Amino acid sequence: HFKESDNSLLLFLEEEFNSSNKLIIVTTKHNFSTIGKMISTVTSDNQVLKDQMLIPSKADKYVKDSYLLEYKKSLTNVISMDEMKKMPKILLTSEKNHATINIFEEDRESANALLNSLAQMHEVSFEVITIIEGWLRVEIASKRYGNISNFIDSAKQLLPRKLISTANIIEYIIKVLDANNKKISFAESCTGGLLSYYFTSHNGASKILDGSLITYSNDLKDNWLAVEHDVLEEYGAVSSQVVEQMSEGVINVSHADYGLSISGIAGDTGGTELKPVGTVYIGVRTKTTHQEVHLHLHGDRNYVQQQSALYAIKMLVTIDKEIFF
């Protein structure tokens, strides 16, 4: 906080321009042009009239009572704000300097190799994080003159139907399903409703999810999902045959467009020599196709449950590339 007559303000501005990547300066309407004059002094600039505001000529982005200026290492947003009045738009946002993308069905080494040359071309840096096998999260940061948007567009061309630009994959799935008038439902055993929770913790879930079923016991798999008793007896609840019928059953019950089923042994007990703890089967079904995966996960109960839910999400996205990519 500075007063208008504070002589240290010029020194403060110069220090901040040299050390800060991002800076927001809030001033009263009375001092708005004074601050602009000080900034112009520090940056060897002059003030000009833009949109009925006297602001530094180097401010290339501006709206009423707010402007953005880039100088040295710093992006500075100056805002004129008075009590009892609506706050002006903040122009300094993270979207310009940071973004997240998700890449599917690609290993980390290959993704790094593909993205490295693009990163140099578009002046961005990135970090690849493995969520699960076949699902990578890429955190992108812009350098001073970088262009994240062009980087992502170029990456999409190299990775057709493999890249989704979003920081929150569940929110993205909900929006896509809603836009396409599609519904989803889950039949969960070892995850105990975790997959449902991942979706219902986001706004808009009720538009695409009418309900789901948690069926721990064989009786409920039989009675609620119409899993055949003979199949349960012959193959056991943790089997590809059972998750196939579970996904079919939950679609029949809910009339959803996508049915996801999970059955496994999360631990810490319950495993056998043939089916040790961490054995999980996941099924994903649409009205026209069905996919399954058999996992051998290593970790505690929570880890097995979380990994199982993440694999189901990945399978949902990749089973219908027509709408998700």
Regions found by a protein language model. Give the residues of each.
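An accessory alpha-helical subdomain
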Residues: 91-151
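Short alpha-helical segments enriched in small residues
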Residues: 1-93, 110-119, 147-325
